[in-house]
Amino acid sequence: MIDLTLQRASTSAVPDSAAFRLWAEAALEKPHAEVVIRIVDREESAALNSTYRGKTGPTNVLSFPFVVPEGVPNDLLGDLVICAPVVEREAAEQGKPVEAHWAHMVVHGMLHLQGYDHIEEAEAEIMENREIAILRGLGMENPYREIRPE
């Protein structure tokens, strides 16, 4: 079960809270967790991307895992920041349904919060396979398959 807080700081149209909860719970690998998902605009995403990753411009999803001190019980998993305009643009560029791309970004971010990464090729393969399996369980296509816009 997930205790999800959804913050909407963007004027873009986004899926409803129930969809975010469904996607986050599908990727959750522990019995209970608290997560904040903040939906932002390009400016906030770019500022956070610069501050925390040293990269210029907005990005699709940023994850901020909460590091729990050893021996302290805590269900707080962390925060995800998703840039609505970037998700919409990427979905269009990749010829994917926008809702499927939203789901992918939530699943991707949730896996990051749980320690998955894609810096090394072997890690990336593990993470991508996990994403594909979770999204398949939600009735969605493989987000990494090549799709050409019509």
UniProtKB/Swiss-Prot annotation:
Binds 1 zinc ion. Zn(2+) binds at H108, H112, H118. Keywords: Cytoplasm, Endonuclease, Hydrolase, Metal-binding, Nuclease, Ribosome biogenesis, rRNA processing, Zinc. InterPro entries: MetalPrtase_cat_dom_sf_prd, YbeY, YbeY_CS. GO terms for molecular function: metalloendopeptidase activity; RNA endonuclease activity; zinc ion binding. Its EC number is 3.1.-.-. SUPFAM superfamilies: Metalloproteases ('zincins'), catalytic domain (SSF55486). It is found in: Cytoplasm. GO terms for biological process: rRNA processing. Its cofactor is Zn(2+). Its main location: cytoplasm. The keyword Hydrolase applies. It is an enzyme of class 3 (hydrolase). GO terms for cellular component: cytoplasm. Single strand-specific metallo-endoribonuclease involved in late-stage 70S ribosome quality control and in maturation of the 3' terminus of the 16S rRNA. This is Endoribonuclease YbeY. The gene is ybeY.
